[in-house]
Amino acid sequence: MSDTLLNPYFGEFGGMYVPEILVPVLKQLEQAFVEAQNDPTFQAEFADLLKNYAGRPTALTLCRNLTKCTKTKLYLKREDLLHGGAHKTNQVLGQILLAKRMGKTRIIAETGAGQHGVATALACAMLDMPCRVYMGAKDVERQSPNVFRMRLMGAEVIPVEKGSCSLKDACCEAMRDWSANYETTHYLLGTAAGPHPFPTIVREFQKMIGEETKRQILEREGRLPDAVIAAVGGGSNAIGMFTDFIDEPNVRLIGVEPAGKGIESGEHGAPLGHAKVGIYFGMKSPLMQTEDGQVEESYSVSAGLDFPSVGPQHAYLNEIGRADYVSITDEEALNAFQELAKHEGIIPALESSHALAYALKLIKQNPEKEQLLVVNLSGRGDKDIFTVDKILNGGTN
């Protein structure tokens, strides 16, 4: 891969493991991205869309009630307030501008929780691009509000009935479509994973989350946080938060994977702590695998975290010890979901609830410890209210 413009690897992780027919397409994308990063006109248009369409910068909110009787200050980076309801809108706008720059006339995407699909649909509507979204049939059912939003904004939503009918299967179908239609189509990948250059592109189009957080916390508290905490599925909201803090050694980076029904049950989506390295989705990264090397089914109550692998930069940060990766069960995430709603009047996405749950766990372990924590509230929970209601009233997800 020595002829790429950017390093395709993070340590041993990453790469471009795709059919030969897609290699020149990925290199074209890399070339366009490098040129766009150095083009003031592109950057100005992207910045304008982020400010005047998406609503950046997002707020940094101090939790007034969750930390009562403790010495912790807990802030939430409010990506739930972004247009579209989650952090996904940031990088979607950047990628569609790139697609237009390359002369592409059609956008495809995959989605799990539906937030990336909604972000893609709204941006395609505004920027006048046709849009097809692949979504696991199981996720179509449990995220029906987002499916309606996507279709309302003109997107074609394709339920994927193969495999586990979840995010990994939607990713595979999107890849197949792209392989057949790459001349006209841009695959708007939704997370900081997949083949190079997607992990780098998505990180660069999400890193304003951490940049804003750093400015805001310094303004509010006069110092950097002790830790920033974010949920990790593929890893885009987390890498967006972490990037500007990587070179701040006194700031702990904590990624929270889904432990599902408990790691010991086998029903989880925590490859960083409990998987072997494999090749999947065009990249080399930790991958949940069966004994004979087949991709294992991941599980989480949160559709957006239900993914058997993880972005390569997270794998690298884990390997070198710069970031810590922990896991939170469905039950713990559901409790955090309710706690934030009840005590702060904010309904978080189930994805974000995993990060919040770990922050609350840290606080409860040592309530007398003076600490400054920031949780990336990556999305709002409107999409999850029916799922949570069903679970709390005796059903199952």
Curated annotation (Swiss-Prot):
Membrane-spanning ranges: none
Give the similarity note: Belongs to the TrpB family.
Needed cofactors, names only, are: pyridoxal 5'-phosphate
Q: Which gene encodes it?
A: trpB
In terms of PANTHER family, this protein maps to: TRYPTOPHAN SYNTHASE (PTHR48077:SF3), TRYPTOPHAN SYNTHASE-RELATED (PTHR48077)
Protein name in the entry:
Tryptophan synthase beta chain
Catalysed transformations (reactions): (1S,2R)-1-C-(indol-3-yl)glycerol 3-phosphate + L-serine = D-glyceraldehyde 3-phosphate + L-tryptophan + H2O
Q: Which UniProt keywords apply?
A: Amino-acid biosynthesis, Aromatic amino acid biosynthesis, Lyase, Pyridoxal phosphate, Tryptophan biosynthesis
Assembly, in brief, is:
Tetramer of two alpha and two beta chains.
| InterPro entries, alphabetized | Trp_synth_b_CS (IPR006653), Trp_synth_beta (IPR006654), Trp_synth_beta/beta-like (IPR023026), TrpB-like_PALP (IPR001926), TrpB-like_PALP_sf (IPR036052)
A Pfam family hit: PALP
Gene3D superfamilies, alphabetized: 3.40.50.1100
A single cellular component GO annotation: cytoplasm
Q: What pathway is this protein said to act in by its record?
A: Amino-acid biosynthesis; L-tryptophan biosynthesis; L-tryptophan from chorismate: step 5/5
User: Where is the PTM N6-(pyridoxal phosphate)lysine found along the chain?
Assistant: K88
What biological function has been recorded for the protein in this entry? The beta subunit is responsible for the synthesis of L-tryptophan from indole and L-serine.
